[in-house]
Swiss-Prot record:
It holds the Pfam family Pox_A11. Homomultimer. Interacts with OPG160. The lineage of its organism: Viruses, Varidnaviria, Bamfordvirae, Nucleocytoviricota, Pokkesviricetes. This is Protein OPG137. It is found in: Host cytoplasm. Residues 145-172 form a coiled coil. Induction: Expressed in the late phase of the viral replicative cycle. It comes from Vaccinia virus (strain Copenhagen) (VACV).
C-alpha cells in the first residue's frame, strides 16, 4: 500500500495511527474507514499526476504550433508542406484548480517528514524539521490513560478507604453514645442506643453473632418492632420461669414425702427434672397458666422462688 503521510488531524478524530513510517507511534491505530478513504484519495492523485506527466498540455501545444506555423526555412506556402491526415485528440483533462491543488499538496507532503530524535533516556523528543504546527510532537497513549485494571484497582482501594473511614466514625459515635448512656447525659439517645444494645445482648445470649454495626441497616421502626418482640418474649420467659420454679419446689416436696412413706424408688426424681426439660415439655402451658393466674414479671417473686427452690433441694422439710 502506498504510504499516506498525514499532516493534520482534527480534534474530533482518532489521533492514533499505525507505526508505518511513524517510529514513535507504536501504540496508535487508525480505523479501516479512514485508511480506505486515504488510500482512495492517494490513488486518485497518483493517477492524475501520472497522466499529467505522460502528456502535458504544454507539449501538445508546442507540437501543434510547430506543425501549423512553419519556420522561415520552410516553403512559402502551406500547400508545399505535406501534412499527414491525422486527427489530434486531446483527451487529457484540462487543468483544474482542484487537481493542481492536490498535486501541489502531494508534492509538499512528500517533502515534509518528521525527523524525530529520541534521547537515550527516552525523555526528550526533538523535532528537527517540521512545518506542521497542528500535530503535537508527542501524543499520550489512550491505553495508559484508560487502563481498565488500574482504574478497577483504584476504585477498590477507594471503597476500602471509605469503609474504613465509615467504620472508624461509627465506632467513635458508638463509644460516645455508650459514655452518654453510662453517665445519663442524653436520655433520648440513651434510650435509642439501649434498644440496640439490648437486641445485641439478647442475640449473644442465644449464640447469635450479632453486633451493633449489623443493626445500622435497620430503620428506627424496625428497631422498635424487634425490641418490642424481644421484650414480650422476655416477659413471657420470666412468667414461665416463675411457674417452673414453683413446679420444681412442688416436685421436691412430693419426693421427700414419698421417701418418708417408704418409696425408695422415687429417690433422685428432683435431680432428673430440670428447668430446661420443663421449658421444652410444658413451657407454653406454663406461660398460659401464668397469664390466666395474672402472674406478671415480678422480680421479687422470682427471687423468692429461686431461693426457696435451692433450700428445698438441700433441706428435708418432711
Amino acid at each position: 500500500m502506498t504510504t499516506v503521510p498525514v499532516t493534520d488531524i482534527q480534534n474530533d478524530l482518532i489521533t492514533e495511527f499505525s507505526e508505518d513510517n511513524y517510529p514513535s507511534n507504536k501504540n496508535y491505530e487508525i480505523t479501516l474507514r479512514q485508511m480506505s478513504i486515504l488510500t482512495h484519495v492517494n490513488n486518485v492523485v497518483d493517477r492524475e499526476h501520472n497522466a499529467a506527466v505522460v502528456s502535458s498540455p504544454e507539449e501538445i501545444s508546442s507540437q501543434l504550433n510547430e506543425d501549423l506555423f512553419p519556420d522561415d526555412d520552410s516553403p512559402a506556402t502551406i500547400i508545399e508542406r505535406v501534412q499527414p491526415h491525422t486527427t489530434i485528440i486531446d483527451d487529457t483533462p484540462p487543468p483544474t484548480f482542484r487537481r493542481e491543488l492536490l498535486i501541489s499538496e502531494q508534492r509538499q507532503q512528500r517533502e515534509k517528514r518528521f525527523n524525530i530524535t529520541v534521547s537515550k533516556n527516552a525523555e526528550a523528543i526533538m523535532e528537527s524539521r517540521s512545518m506542521i504546527s497542528s500535530m503535537p510532537t508527542q501524543t499520550p497513549s489512550l491505553g495508559v490513560v484508560y487502563d481498565k485494571d488500574k482504574r478497577i484497582q483504584m476504585l477498590e482501594d477507594e471503597v476500602v478507604n471509605l469503609r474504613n473511614q465509615r467504620s472508624n466514625t461509627k465506632s467513635s459515635d458508638n463509644l460516645d453514645n455508650f459514655t452518654r448512656i453510662l453517665f445519663g447525659k442524653t436520655p433520648y439517645k440513651s434510650t435509642e442506643v439501649n434498644k440496640r444494645i439490648a437486641i445485641v445482648n439478647y442475640a449473644n445470649l442465644n449464640g447469635s453473632p450479632l453486633s451493633v454495626e449489623d443493626l445500622d441497616v435497620c430503620s428506627e421502626d424496625e428497631i422498635d418492632r424487634i425490641y418490642k418482640t424481644i421484650k414480650q418474649y422476655h416477659e413471657s420467659r420470666k412468667r414461665k420461669i416463675i411457674v417452673t420454679n414453683v413446679i420444681i419446689i412442688v416436685i421436691n416436696i412430693i419426693e421427700q414425702a414419698l421417701l418418708k412413706l417408704g418409696f425408695e424408688e422415687i429417690k433422685g426424681l428432683s435431680t432428673d427434672i430440670t428447668s430446661e426439660i420443663i421449658d421444652v415439655e410444658i413451657g407454653d402451658d406454663c406461660d398460659a397458666v401464668a397469664s390466666k393466674l395474672g402472674i406478671g414479671n415480678s422480680p421479687v417473686l422470682n427471687i423468692v422462688l429461686f431461693i426457696l427452690k435451692i433450700f428445698v433441694k438441700r433441706i428435708k422439710i418432711i
